[in-house]
A protein has these predicted regions:
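Short, structured segments at the rim of ligand-binding sites
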Residues: 1-198
Length: 198
């Protein structure tokens, strides 16, 4: 026989890092390896977040008073920036001071979260496989629609950071990829309720 250690989910970890950065909260994650987060942690650093690694796989993240932008991201296979984190980074960048260009090289039509983010007040312009994100001062609660798993997670993170209440349809997509995400995000100070729509 053999013993295997299953690595932590870097996309789930990245989701919580983005949510904390958007809401201005400090976060400690346990169980992730530095190499797993590579390009994600580098992108967070470019927004002004400070990341500290401790022994035993502890990662501390402290966001700046105002997130920063003015850089470009290109998605790609590991170790490049993961396409599954692109919607979350886009959500974060909506509140960053400056402009960022995101180039999606893995999947076509991977910017479905942009429509919902714009309903919340974001300034995003799509041109083919490239998205230009111009940071705004604040987002506002809105009724939005998750069209896939990561789109839903991005909209939830944006709803946490937005002023007022948001209604995010399509929670079944998010529940498929995250275990009790509403509980985890509530630890960041959000008030989330899952409801059945008739």
């Amino acid at each position: 026989g053999a013993v295997f250690t299953i690595p932590a989910d870097r996309i789930e970890g990245g989701t919580f890092l983005c949510a904390a950065a958007m809401t201005g909260g400090e976060l400690c994650l346990k169980g992730l390896e530095r190499e797993q987060l590579g390009a994600v942690s580098e992108a967070l650093r470019m927004t002004g977040c400070r990341l500290f690694w401790e022994e035993g796989g502890l990662l501390w993240m402290r966001p700046p008073r105002r997130l920063l932008s003015d850089f470009s991201i290109i998605t790609g296979p590991f170790p490049a920036f993961p396409t599954d984190m692109q919607p979350l980074l886009m959500a974060l960048l909506t509140l960053a001071k400056g402009h960022c260009m995101i180039s999606e090289t893995v999947f076509e039509a991977r910017f479905s979260q942009a429509e919902g983010l714009c309903r919340m007040g974001a300034d995003i312009r799509i041109e083919g496989r490239r998205a230009s994100v111009f940071g705004v001062e604040r987002l506002f609660g809105a009724e939005v629609f998750a069209k896939d798993l990561r789109c839903g997670a991005a909209l939830l993170c944006a709803a946490l950071a937005a002023e007022g209440e948001s209604l995010v349809h399509g929670s079944e997509f998010v529940e498929r990829g995250y275990e009790k995400i509403e509980t985890a995000l509530s630890l960041l100070g959000g008030e989330i309720r899952l409801t059945e729509q008739g």
